[in-house]
Each structure stands twice: as structure tokens, then as C-alpha cells.
């Protein structure tokens, strides 16, 4: 029991330290992201708790608001449609990394909407910065998990600022404590052929077909 308390204290200390480093960078990014241009995408920050809030999954969803194609990372989104983007560790057959449309396919297939969210509308320039962040992502381990990917990508341009919390319970609390949060937003239902894994980073990144099915292991 003493060891568990000590481990918990260490994790909380690391979370606070990470937040202290991320905050100045994210605040500056928000200032750079301020723009009165046309909003081209509605970006959602989604969190679905699991196992009595002890675990969960966090991801982003991008809805095209225009009458033309928009680019989210490596994925082209048609007018009126959207794409989910999330980082996975173990609950995926094709290995750790960033995936497109896994959440949208899984949650539509299972007909579940027990997730909470925040949303914001962003301009084309802001979307370009978000896409750059996605293309540079791909690493997954316990301290840099799905929450880390979603929060640090959201914070590139969006308000409210979200502090990275490795513990799913704290991610959930950050969302529901915001008076503008919602529950169960609708996502475009992609076919299995529209699910991809991002392989490589930056200019070397590419898409490969991926299996959206869950392995049953914790995310």
C-alpha cells in the first residue's frame, strides 16, 4: 500500500511538472492561432471513460464545414464528412501509433455515444498547424499516451487550454468542468477501407490500411 501511494505521488508530480512546461508553449500557440478568417473545420476533443473512469480513450475529430476538400494530417476530408484521429498503444492490431477513423468506425459500429467532448471551429491556417503536429506524432507509451497526443494537438490552436493529464480520470474532469462541454457528438461512419495508420513522420509520413477492430486490451 505504501508503495502504491508513493507511485501515485510520483505520477502526480510528473503530471504537474509536465503541465508547467506545456502551459507557456500552448499559451503562445493560442496567441499565434488567433484569427478572424473563415472557419473551415470544427475540431472536437473527445474522451470516453472505461473501467469506472480508471481507464479511457481520448481522441480528436475533424468535421469539414466547407463545400470543398480539406486536409487533416495525411487524410483528405470531403465536404460534410469528418475524420477521427487518435493515438493507440495496445488496443489495436497494427501496432502503436496514430490512426485515422478508428474511433469513428468503432463507436458507430457499436452504436455508442457515452463520451464527453469540447469543440471549437478553426481556420485553414490553424488547421495547417494542427496537421503539422499530427504528422510529427506517432510515439506511444504510458506517459505519452492517447491523452498526450490529443491534448497537445488541441492546444496548438484551441481554447480552452487543456493541461496534459496522464490519468484518464483527470482528463475527464477537465472536460466536464467546462460549462461548454457536451456529450456524444455525431461522427461520420467510415467504412473499414477508410481506416488508416500513419507510418513515418513529417515529410516521410504515409498512410497504410489498418484494422479498426479492438484487441480487447486496455488502450
Model-derived features: positions:
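Post-signal peptide N-terminal regions of Sec-secreted extracellular proteins
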Residues: 30-35, 112, 120-132, 215-218
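Sec-dependent signal peptide cleavage junction
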Residues: 20-32
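Bacterial N-terminal signal peptides that target proteins for export
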Residues: 1-11
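Second-shell loop/turn segments in exported
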Residues: 48-49, 113-119, 132-141
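Hydrophobic core
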Residues: 12-21
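Solvent-exposed, acidic/flexible segments
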Residues: 52-55, 120-127, 139-147
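Glycine-rich catalytic cores of cysteine/serine-nucleophile enzymes that process amide/ester linkages
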Residues: 32-112
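Activation targets extended, charge/polar-rich intrinsically disordered C-terminal tails
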Residues: 129-219
Amino acid at each position: 500500500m505504501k508503495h502504491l501511494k508513493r507511485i501515485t505521488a510520483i505520477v502526480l508530480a510528473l503530471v504537474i511538472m509536465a503541465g508547467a512546461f506545456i502551459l507557456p508553449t500552448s499559451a503562445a500557440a493560442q496567441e499565434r492561432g488567433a484569427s478572424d478568417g473563415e472557419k473551415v473545420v470544427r475540431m472536437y476533443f473527445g474522451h470516453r471513460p472505461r473501467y469506472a473512469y480508471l481507464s479511457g480513450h481520448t481522441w480528436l475529430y475533424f468535421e469539414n464545414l466547407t463545400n470543398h476538400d480539406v486536409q487533416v494530417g495525411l487524410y483528405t476530408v470531403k465536404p460534410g464528412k469528418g475524420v477521427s484521429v487518435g493515438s493507440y498503444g495496445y488496443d489495436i492490431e497494427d501496432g502503436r501509433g496514430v490512426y485515422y477513423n478508428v474511433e469513428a468506425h468503432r463507436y458507430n459500429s457499436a452504436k455508442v455515444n457515452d463520451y464527453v467532448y469540447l469543440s471549437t471551429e478553426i481556420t485553414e491556417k490553424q488547421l495547417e498547424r494542427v496537421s503539422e503536429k499530427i504528422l510529427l506524432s506517432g510515439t506511444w507509451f504510458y506517459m505519452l499516451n492517447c491523452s498526450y497526443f490529443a491534448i497537445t494537438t488541441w492546444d496548438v490552436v484551441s481554447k480552452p487550454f487543456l493541461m496534459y493529464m496522464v490519468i484518464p480520470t483527470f482528463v475527464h474532469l477537465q472536460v466536464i468542468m467546462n460549462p461548454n462541454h457536451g456529450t456524444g457528438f455525431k461522427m461520420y461512419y467510415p467504412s473499414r477501407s477508410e481506416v488508416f495508420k500513419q507510418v513515418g513522420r513529417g515529410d516521410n509520413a504515409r498512410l497504410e490500411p489498418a484494422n479498426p477492430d479492438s484487441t480487447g486490451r486496455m488502450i
